[in-house]
Amino acid sequence: MSDTAAALKALLLEKSVRTGTFTLASGKESDLYIDCRVTALDPFGANLIGKLGWAAVREKINTENLKIDAIGGMTLGADPISLAVGMTSAVAHPDEALQVFTVRKEPKGHGRGKQIEGNF
């Protein structure tokens, strides 16, 4: 495990893993709750996620000879992750900087009614 991955693991354990009594989305109870958003929204966590994510994207680009222009996913979970990777890409390789996008479950009910936001 790389130093970056080890640091992210430690931060996840510190910030995102909780014990106690929790009601899950399914309605079931659990004595363990993991909320990775807490780590992803932490500036140090975002930095580590960005480094690891950008390394994974670069590996995919190189091994499969791909051209990747953007990164994103469903809001809210993907937002801090894709932004961290996009920002890291811009700092590390400005000529290959990834645009970031987010996808809503439903189109907006006002304005331009967009379901996907980003710089395309």
Task: For each feature predicted by the language model, list its residue ranges.
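Active-site-facing substrate-recognition patch
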Residues: 1-63
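Conserved hydrophobic/aromatic pocket- or pore-lining residues that grip, position, or stack substrates
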Residues: 27, 71, 100
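Short active-site-adjacent helix-start/loop capping segments
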Residues: 32, 79-82
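Fold-independent oxyanion-binding glycine-rich loops
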Residues: 36-37, 74-75, 103-106
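Loop/helix-junction capping segments adjacent to catalytic residues or to phosphate/diphosphate-binding pockets
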Residues: 40-43, 79, 110
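Glycine-centered small-residue hotspots that permit tight backbone geometry or close packing
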Residues: 45, 72-73, 109-112
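Short glycine-rich phosphate-binding loop at a beta-alpha junction
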Residues: 64-77
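Short, glycine/charge-rich flexible loops or terminal/linker lids adjacent to PRPP-binding catalytic cores
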Residues: 82-120
